[in-house]
């Protein structure tokens, strides 16, 4: 269980917080704040981002629009299930959840309502926090239709690429999902999007660790990858 950690400090168990089970897409995690007062997480994060910018460091926000913390059809109801389950989630013909995320549910990203939610969220982080870009977790889900089938020209990806407010931020796709859709080198978006290249990462890391048998794959990954594959 990724939420548990057996390590202890002074007998107290430490708990991991990966931030990948989103409840509020517009809200920073309050557990990271230093202040004792409530509602300081936004102020502290803005201060951190400004300090990084002042030192020439860009801030790329890792966003997870492929699923939520509400789990599968037997999971808790926090928000979207109660608002309109049929709109916000991809449902099978028998009313269960498609699970292309590996987390129990899959956001219905190309429904107009969900598209608008994602667009407004990215605009919010761009305008209010001045982040420099976004890395989209399991981004192939962003290109699936309401029935789960891959789309050639997904409306959401096109909308984000063409939006004037997002025109100066980086858009980086982790171009696969847990449903087997692997799109590194063929992500269905314009040159506006870069791709997260998992093969490059894995093969080069393996080679640097001393796995000489992986030298060819590491060399191929370096020489064959284009500059838009991060």
Model-flagged regions — what are they?
Residues 1-130, 135-162, 181:
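Substrate-binding/active-site clefts of carbohydrate-active enzymes
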Residues 130, 143-147, 151-230:
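Conserved alpha/beta catalytic core and glycan-binding cleft of carbohydrate-active enzymes
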């Amino acid at each position: 269980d990724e939420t548990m950690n057996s390590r202890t400090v002074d007998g107290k168990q430490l708990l991991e917080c990966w931030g990948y089970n989103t409840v509020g897409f517009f809200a920073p995690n309050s557990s990271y704040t230093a202040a004792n007062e409530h509602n300081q997480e936004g102020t502290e994060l803005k201060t951190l981002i400004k300090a990084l910018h002042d030192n020439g460091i860009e801030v790329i926000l890792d966003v997870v629009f492929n699923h939520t913390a509400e789990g599968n059809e037997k999971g808790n109801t926090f928000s979207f299930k109660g608002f309109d389950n049929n709109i916000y989630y991809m449902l099978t013909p028998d009313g269960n959840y498609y699970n292309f995320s590996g987390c129990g549910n899959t956001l219905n990203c190309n429904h107009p309502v969900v598209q608008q939610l994602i667009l407004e969220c990215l605009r919010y982080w761009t305008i209010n926090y001045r982040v420099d870009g976004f890395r989209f977790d399991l981004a192939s889900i962003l290109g699936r239709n309401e029935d789960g089938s891959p789309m050639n020209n997904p409306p959401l990806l096109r909308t984000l690429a063409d939006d004037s407010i997002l025109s100066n931020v980086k858009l980086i796709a982790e171009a696969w999902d847990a449903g087997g859709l692997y799109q590194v080198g063929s992500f269905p978006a314009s040159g506006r999007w870069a791709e997260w290249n998992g093969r490059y990462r894995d093969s080069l890391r393996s080679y640097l660790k001393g796995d000489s048998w992986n030298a060819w794959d590491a060399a191929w990954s370096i020489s064959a990858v284009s500059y838009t594959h991060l």
